[in-house]
Structure formats: structure tokens, C-alpha cells
Amino acid sequence: MKLDKYTVGKRYGKALFELAVEKNQAEAIYQELLTLREVYHQVPGIGDILSDDRLEPYEKDSIMEKLVTGFSEMMQNFLRVVYEYRRMYDLLLMIDEYERRYDEHQGLILGSVTTAIPLSKEQHQAMEEKAAQLLGYEQAHLVNLIDPSIVGGVVIEANHQVIDGSIRKQLEHMQQKLLK
């Protein structure tokens, strides 16, 4: 059974993170992955090129050697495994998973806070502190999204969890109770 790219991304990202933690290289690998992500953004088709069967193996090997040059031995080995299993087009998903685990390991959660109007700097900071506390993290970084349709209140989304304290949701809940 062929695995979907999200499952592959999670597995490879998790494996790399666990190895990096075991070898006390989590920060260094994280920095290398940020560099690699930048390369992927500068050359968007590189993952597809390295996975393309129409190219001769020696051509892909040459590109691959240029790509891994300058990275640590662990990162080079990881990239070679990903390349050998023809998963270079899934690399950004692997990086995302590693980054999620790295942030979690650091006690940091990333997410969003949706409000009807923009938050002030003080409100935004207070919201991040409250979200971190509610979700059990040391700190949170939340992007403020604006959606006037929530009427008021806030909706916090982080780590596949949603805390909906919007006026819209409260009104919907009251409407359901009244209709019963």
C-alpha cells in the first residue's frame, strides 16, 4: 500500500527529529532544514526534478551532490535516503513535521488567533500568553487573522486544536438551544 505524502512527511520528519535529539543535534539540523527550505523556495521544482524518471540517474546524482554539499553528515545521509526512496518532492512536508516537533520540544506552539478587529500589541501578547497556558506550552506565537463575521470574541487555532470563543459561535449555540 502506497503511503500518502503527508504520512511520509510525518514519518521522515519524526525519524530525523528523534535521531537529531538523540545525537544532540536538534538545533543544528533545524538550522540546516531552514536553509534547505529556502533552497526549495528559490528553486521550486527541485523536488520534482530529483524524482523525475525522465532524467538520467547521473544527472540527478550530480544535482543531489551539489545540494548536499555543505550540510552535516547527518543531514547528507538523511537527504540521500530521501533521494534513494524517491521522496524529494515530499521534503517540505518532512521539514514542516521536523519544525513542528522542534518547536514543541522547545515549549513553543504556533497557531492563529482570529478576531473581528485587529488586536493591539498588548492584546496580542496577552492572547499568546493565555493560549500557551491553555494549551500547556511555555510560549505561543499566534498570527492575528481578521474575520468580521465572528462578530466579537476570539478563535484560537493551534496544534490541531480549536478554542472558539467567538460571539458567532455563542449565538449559534443559543439558537440551537432555543430550537430544541
Swiss-Prot record:
Keyword annotations of the record: ATP synthesis, Cell membrane, CF(1), Hydrogen ion transport, Ion transport, Membrane, Transport
Transmembrane residue ranges: none
GO CC list: plasma membrane; proton-transporting ATP synthase complex
Molecular-function GO term, any one: proton-transporting ATP synthase activity, rotational mechanism
Bilayer disposition of the protein: Peripheral membrane protein
InterPro entries tied to this protein: ATP_synth_OSCP/delta_N_sf, ATPase_OSCP/dsu
UniProt cross-references to SUPFAM superfamilies, sorted A to Z: N-terminal domain of the delta subunit of the F1F0-ATP synthase (SSF47928)
Chief location bin: membrane
Pfam families (UniProt xref): OSCP
UniProt-annotated location(s): Cell membrane
Family affiliation: Belongs to the ATPase delta chain family.
Quaternary state and interactors: F-type ATPases have 2 components, F(1) - the catalytic core - and F(0) - the membrane proton channel. F(1) has five subunits: alpha(3), beta(3), gamma(1), delta(1), epsilon(1). F(0) has three main subunits: a(1), b(2) and c(10-14). The alpha and beta chains form an alternating ring which encloses part of the gamma chain. F(1) is attached to F(0) by a central stalk formed by the gamma and epsilon chains, while a peripheral stalk is formed by the delta and b chains.
Biological function: F(1)F(0) ATP synthase produces ATP from ADP in the presence of a proton or sodium gradient. F-type ATPases consist of two structural domains, F(1) containing the extramembraneous catalytic core and F(0) containing the membrane proton channel, linked together by a central stalk and a peripheral stalk. During catalysis, ATP synthesis in the catalytic domain of F(1) is coupled via a rotary mechanism of the central stalk subunits to proton translocation.
Protein name as annotated: ATP synthase subunit delta
Native source organism of the sequence: Enterococcus faecalis (strain ATCC 700802 / V583)
The encoding gene: atpH
